[in-house]
Amino acid sequence: MAIRSLPSSSRCSSSSSSSSYSLASTSLSNRLETIFKKASELCTLCDIEACVIYYGPDGELKTWPPEREKVEDIALRYSQLNEALRRKKSVTLYDFLNKKKDKTNLEKKAKITDNDDLKTCLKNVNILKYPLADHYSPDQVSQLIQSLEPHVSKVRERIRFVESQKHKETKPDHQSLASSSLNHQTQSLNPSQFSLFMYNHGDNTLSQIPVSASNFNQDYFSALLEQSELKSQIMKQDLCGYEQNMCMSNHGDATLSQIPLSASNLNQDFSALLQDESGLMQQELCGYDQNMFMNNNNFQHSFVSNTQDHSAPVVQESVNNNYGLMPHVPCGYDQNLFTSDITNNNLLINNSMFL
C-alpha cells in the first residue's frame, strides 16, 4: 500500500476550508445559544408558549425547551391550525414594510383632513365675527363708516408721532456734523498757527516774534492801522511801471519836494535837494522792493538799477549834512534800509524784489 503526499496547494486549500468551517460552526453555535435565550425571555415576558426546533449541518437535532414532550405538543397544536390562523400573527420583512407604509399614508390623510376641517372652521368663525357688508343697507353702511372714523384718526396720529420721533433722532446727528465742521474751520483759522519773523540787517539774522491769539487781532492790526494813517497824512506816492518818485521832507522850512526817479532821469543832479543846514531831515521812501544805502556826511550814488537792467551813468556828488544821522522811514512793503557812518559811501537804489 503506497501513500502519496498531497501537493502544497491542496494542503493550503484544505486548511483554509477547515478553518472557515470551524469559524462558521463557532458562530452558529453562538447564535443558537442566543436564539434559545431570546425564546426563553419571550415566553417569560409575554406569558406565551414557544418552542425552537433546530437541525444542524450534520443532522443533529436540538430543541428548546430541552424536554421533547413539550416541543412535540406545541408542534402538534400548530400543525392542526389552518393557513389563515397560522399567518395571523406571522410577519415577514415585506409585510412589515408594507404595514409601515400604509400607516404613514393614513397619518398624512388624517392631517390633510384635519387641516381642511380647521380651515373651514376658521372661515366660519371669521364670517361670524366679521360679517360681510354686501347685504348691508345704506344706513348700516353709514353707521359702519362712522364707527371706523375714530380708529382711523388714532392711527394717523400714531403715524405722525412716529415720524416726529424719527426726525428728532436724525436732527442731533446733523447738528453734531455741523458743529464738528465749524470747529474744524475755527481751528484752521486760529491765529496761533501763524508766526511773524523779523530780519536784522546788522548781523543778517532772522528772529521769530511770538503772536498770541489774544493780541493778534487787536494790538497788531491797531498799530498797523495807526502807522498807515500817519504815513498817509505825510505823503502819497503812486508807482506805474518803472516810474518811481522820491519825496524829501525839509522840517526846517516845512517844505515837501518830489523827485521823479525813472530810468530816463536817474542821471540828473539831485544832490542840491538833499542839502539841509537848518534842521534834521526825514526821508521817506514810498513804494515797494527798494534797497537804500545812506551815508552820514558825504555819500555818492554810483548807479540806480531796475529789474530790467536799466542802468544809469555814474553820478558823483557830495552832500554836506551838519546834523548827523538822518532818520529813514520806509513806506510800503518789502523794503530794506541800511545806514552807515563811514564817509564816501555809495547810494544804491535798486528796484528788484527783496524776498
Swiss-Prot record:
GO terms for cellular component: nucleus. It comes from the Eukaryota. Residues 162-174 have a biased composition (Basic and acidic residues). CDD domains: MADS_SRF_like (cd00266). Pfam families: SRF-TF. It is found in: Nucleus. Residues 1-22, 162-186 are annotated as: Disordered. Probable transcription factor that may function in the maintenance of the proper function of the central cell in pollen tube attraction. Interacts with MEE14/CBP1. This is Agamous-like MADS-box protein AGL81.
